[in-house]
């Protein structure tokens, strides 16, 4: 992270998070963030306060258990509408994309179109990539990398009325020609997912690898080789995944290291509470204060309720609800 300003600033970095295909344990974050929050796409974003002209390296260590079968997730009407919107690189309102979407009109047909009509360009992996976006790659179908395969799928799906978004992260491959990686110098990967209303789940697919492997099915059967770092749904450009946080002079460095193992130690969430009440109050006026719930563990803490009791005050018992808290995050509750 870098603050080029002459004044302090708050900035943030995305860390790998739980989603319907993976469970994440964060063993350590150094230095510890001032807070971690969950954005609209479920990403965990760690916040840092940087002094003027300060650079800060953040080291995150952890593990993840990856599944090939997604967990269910119900979307609200507002969420579905969000995942149908046109974005900078997902130009769902583009006339050509709208025409194709009307003809294809299903996730599988859209997937097949992307696989069969784009050509993977391995020469672009070594270059500083200019992201073409969905509309751009339709003008040059012979020069696509994983970003364009993903962008075109997302744009076509959204234009067809199918909620869709992109995933960026690590994909385990032993054959870079058949299963290439082409996102950032850390050689990450990008793939799309669409929402299946019948299954009530986000379904990940990989048109890039189906194209480059010559037909291995990455639509009906997913694998254990994809580990998401970030999900982009509300914004086609943000957040940036681990490996994408580069400052001048570090663009060729490798910041992400992943090893595959069968060992995964599941942890239970651990919460702590502190209070912020005034030491004195005026008689007849309501007593208000804050209760800070902190997640001191490395795993996601689920929604729950905390009971607040008082011996000589009314009400004598209050139940305060709070939403999920990510590792090293906190919630501030108001009690009165």
For the regions a language model picked out, list residue spans one by one.
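Active-site neighborhood of thiol-dependent amide/isopeptide-bond enzymes
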Residues: 103-108, 112-190, 195, 213-224
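Intrinsically disordered, low-complexity Pro/Gly/Ser/Thr-rich segments with frequent PxxP/GP/PP motifs
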Residues: 43-57, 312-336
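Intrinsically disordered, low-complexity N-terminal segments that are enriched in acidic
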Residues: 1-68
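Short, solvent-exposed loop/turn segments enriched in Ser/Thr/Gly
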Residues: 283-290, 303, 318, 331
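Asparagine-centered strand-capping/turn motif at beta-strand->loop junctions
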Residues: 1-5, 292-298
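Active-site rim recognition segments
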Residues: 174-272
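Acidic low-complexity segments
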Residues: 38-42, 50-141
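Short acidic, flexible loop segments centered on an aromatic residue
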Residues: 12-18, 144, 298-314
């Amino acid at each position: 992270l870098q603050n080029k300003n002459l004044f302090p600033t708050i900035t943030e970095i995305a860390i790998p998070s739980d989603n319907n295909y993976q469970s994440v344990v964060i063993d350590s974050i150094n230095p510890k963030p001032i807070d971690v929050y969950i954005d609209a796409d479920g990403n965990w974003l760690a916040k840092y306060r940087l002094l003027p002209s300060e650079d800060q390296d953040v080291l995150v260590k952890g593990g993840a258990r990856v599944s090939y079968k997604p967990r269910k997730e119900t979307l609200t009407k507002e969420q579905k509408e969000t995942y149908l919107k046109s974005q900078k690189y997902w130009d769902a309102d583009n006339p050509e994309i709208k025409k194709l979407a009307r003809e294809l009109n299903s996730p599988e047909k859209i997937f097949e179109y992307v696989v069969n009509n784009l050509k993977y360009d391995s020469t672009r992996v070594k270059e500083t990539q200019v992201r073409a976006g969905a509309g751009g790659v339709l003008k040059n179908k012979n020069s696509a990398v994983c970003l364009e395969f993903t962008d075109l799928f997302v744009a076509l799906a959204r234009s067809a009325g199918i909620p869709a978004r992109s995933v960026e992260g690590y994909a385990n491959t032993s054959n870079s020609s058949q299963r290439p990686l082409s996102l950032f110098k850390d050689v990450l990967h990008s793939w799309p997912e669409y929402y299946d209303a019948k299954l009530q789940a986000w379904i990940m697919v990989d048109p890039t690898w189906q194209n480059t492997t010559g037909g291995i099915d990455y639509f009906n059967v997913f694998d254990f080789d994809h580990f998401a770092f970030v999900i982009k749904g509300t914004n086609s450009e943000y957040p940036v995944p681990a490996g994408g946080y580069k400052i001048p002079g570090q663009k060729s460095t490798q910041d992400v290291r992943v090893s595959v193992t069968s060992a995964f130690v599941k942890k239970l969430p651990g919460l702590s509470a502190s209070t912020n009440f005034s030491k004195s109050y005026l008689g007849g006026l309501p007593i208000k204060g804050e209760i800070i719930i902190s997640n001191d563990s490395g795993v996601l803490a689920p929604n729950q309720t905390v009971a607040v009791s008082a011996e000589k005050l009314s009400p004598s018992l209050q139940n305060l609800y709070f939403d999920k808290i990510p590792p090293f995050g906190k919630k501030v509750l108001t009690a009165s």
